[in-house]
Amino acid sequence: MSSELAAPPGVVWERIASMDGINHELSPWFRMTAPAGLALSPELVPLGRRWFRSWILLFGVIPFDYDDLCVEELEPGRRFLERSTMLSARVWEHERTLDPVGDGGTRLTDRVRFQPRIRLLTGIHRTIIAATFRHRHRRLRTHFSSTMTASA
């Protein structure tokens, strides 16, 4: 899924690389936790190994899943690749890229791959993940007051 945002990549990166920004994208449906005082600073990210466990809270309060967050690749201001395990998924892979477009805008692209622990739930997972990323992109477009349209 991709969206064009009415802000330069550096501004978009600042937003998406912060817990406040991540949780704004997910709200009001979900919230992710992080250790108190954690800085999402590129030089502090331990590439290729578990960084921390983030609880995923339904409606911001009900724990229903966790993400053992592992950032495999990081290009600050441009791209990250997360390859983690979750309570619900044996494999969770999320790649997000930022590319400059037009007159100071950014194309933000998310690519997700997952393997649920329970195969029978694959369809439900796919539906929830697609809806969640549509919601996240809508929140980002609103936040950056984009006049561009989304493409899936």
Language-model region placement:
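Beta-strand/loop substructures that line and gate deep hydrophobic ligand-binding cavities in soluble
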Residues: 81-131
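Glycine-rich portal/gate segments that line the openings of hydrophobic small-molecule binding cavities
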Residues: 34-85, 146
